[in-house]
C-alpha cells in the first residue's frame, strides 16, 4: 500500500501541528507492505525544506510550480486534482484539518479540536469562514478522522455528527532533545526556579491562558503552592 503524508506543516514556522506531523512522520518506516512518501509544496524552491524535513526517512515529493497558499485559495473554484500535483497513493494523510478536493484513494484527516465552533470569537473572520467550509468537506470525504485526545473525539462526534467508530485518537508528545546545560542556561536567563508548572504552546487567546493564569493565582492564594507558572511558546493571533 502506498501511503502519502502531507508534510506541509513541518515547513516554515513550525507550530504545534508541525511538531505533531514531524514527530509522527519521522517514526514511520516503509515495510510490511507499506510504502511511505511525503508531499510538500515549495514554490520555485524558495524554502529550506531539506533542513525542515531532516530526519524523516522517506522519499519527499516536492511541488515547485504552485505555492501552497495559492492552491488553497483556488481549489474550490479551479478543478485541479491533487494527483495532478503529486503521484497517486492508496492512502493520503492530511495533518492540518483539511483534505483537498478531488483526492483519489482513501484519506485520513487529523482534526485537533473544535475551537472554530466552540470559540469562534478567538479566530480571524476570514479564516473562520474558510474553515467552516473546508472542515465540513474534509470530515465527509475522510475515511478516518484522527484527533489528539478523548475529549476532542467526543467534541467531533457531538458537533460534527461523526460516528465514534470513524474517529481514532493518536496522542501528541514533545520530542525532548535538549541537553541539561540548555535547561540550566534558560532557567538562569529567565529567572525560572523549581518547582514550576509549564505550559508549552502558542501564546494566543484561544489557548485559554487567561483561565490558566486565574487558576494558578487561586492555587497560589488558597493552597499556597510554591510553584512558578512558566509559559513557553511563540506569539500567535492577538498575542498582545
Which sequence ranges carry the predicted segments?
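Carbohydrate transferase catalytic cores enriched for Leloir-type hexosyltransferases
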Residues: 1-240
